[in-house]
Swiss-Prot record:
This is NAD kinase. The active site is at D44. It catalyses: NAD(+) + ATP = ADP + NADP(+) + H(+). It is an enzyme of class 2 (transferase). Keywords: ATP-binding, Cytoplasm, Kinase, NAD, NADP, Nucleotide-binding, Transferase. Its main location: cytoplasm. InterPro entries: ATP-NAD_kinase_N, ATP-NAD_kinase_PpnK-typ_C, NAD/diacylglycerol_kinase_sf, NADK. It is found in: Cytoplasm. The gene is nadK. Involved in the regulation of the intracellular balance of NAD and NADP, and is a key enzyme in the biosynthesis of NADP. Catalyzes specifically the phosphorylation on 2'-hydroxyl of the adenosine moiety of NAD to yield NADP. One of its GO terms (biological process) is NADP biosynthetic process. It comes from the Bacteria. Belongs to the NAD kinase family.
Length: 254
């Protein structure tokens, strides 16, 4: 079925705004809740923002790259958009759910499509205790931080921190240490997708830590729990032969 009603959104970048004007004039602009498909014009950061803002609509999102990297985006072209949408392959992503507790007792809930990261917020290294499914697995990780990522997010911050790239269909999460000092050679672990990961911050007042879920931060955390959220799904559209699985494989040979 060829989508007839398309809702366009764009980042603030001039090139994305120009594309928005061109595409909306050519294909029409439908209010997002009434659209058959949403077309996001921008880069990966804007795609993540769009997925977060439209997650309650259950409408597929097709990205067109008007940014830099564009890992989650398709190539930009003004012609044949409806045909591309009709032929696109859909990928379903389940995000991570983060529950962060601060030293003041505040509780924050966040959703992350790529990763949840903990980062030292002061000059001293973070000290983290790591538990998985209620069992302490590491009493003390001395590091700049740590993260938990989905397969879709494994090529982002995780890969830069020397974490593994995960196949898109793998039912696993990557737990990756960021600049670990002790244990010095410990890089991280692969965990079942169903795992509940908990970080407890040791000596949080002296060694403050912030938690970040896809760019949305919580400062002065004392504990963070992370799990997959199966009740939330994000629908991404990709051109045939250029889905996430192909992109993940290609990323490892560049």
């Amino acid at each position: 079925m060829t989508p007839q009603r398309i809702g366009f959104v764009a980042s603030n970048a001039p090139v994305a705004q120009e594309a928005l004007n061109v595409m909306a004039a050519r294909y029409g602009q439908c209010p997002l809740p009434e659209a058959d498909a949403i077309v996001a014009l921008g880069g990966d950061g804007f795609m993540l923002q769009t997925l977060h803002e439209t997650q309650s609509l259950d409408i597929p999102v097709y990205g067109m790259n008007r940014g830099t990297v564009g890992f989650l985006m398709n190539g930009y072209a003004e012609d044949g958009l409806r045909e591309r949408l009709a032929e696109a392959e859909e990928e379903i992503l389940n995000p991570l759910a983060m529950t962060a507790v601060t030293g003041a007792g505040e509780v924050f809930h966040r959703i992350a499509i790529n990763e949840v990261s903990l980062l030292r917020a002061g000059p001293q290294a973070a000290w983290l205790k790591i538990s998985v499914d209620g069992k302490v697995r590491m009493e003390e990780l001395v590091c700049d931080g740590a993260l938990v990522c989905t397969p879709a997010g494994s090529t982002a911050y995780n890969y830069s921190a020397h974490g593994p790239i995960l196949p898109i269909g793998a039912d696993v999460l990557a737990l990756t240490a960021i600049a670990p000092f002790r244990p010095r050679r410990w890089r991280g672990a692969l965990l079942p997708k169903t795992a509940l990961v908990r970080f407890d911050v040791i000596d949080a007042q002296k060694r403050p830590v912030m938690a970040d879920a896809d760019g949305r931060s919580v400062r002065d955390v004392v504990s963070v729990e992370i799990r997959t959220e199966p009740a939330v799904r994000h629908r991404l559209l990709f051109d045939p032969g250029h889905g996430l699985e192909e992109r993940l494989i290609r990323e490892q040979f560049v």
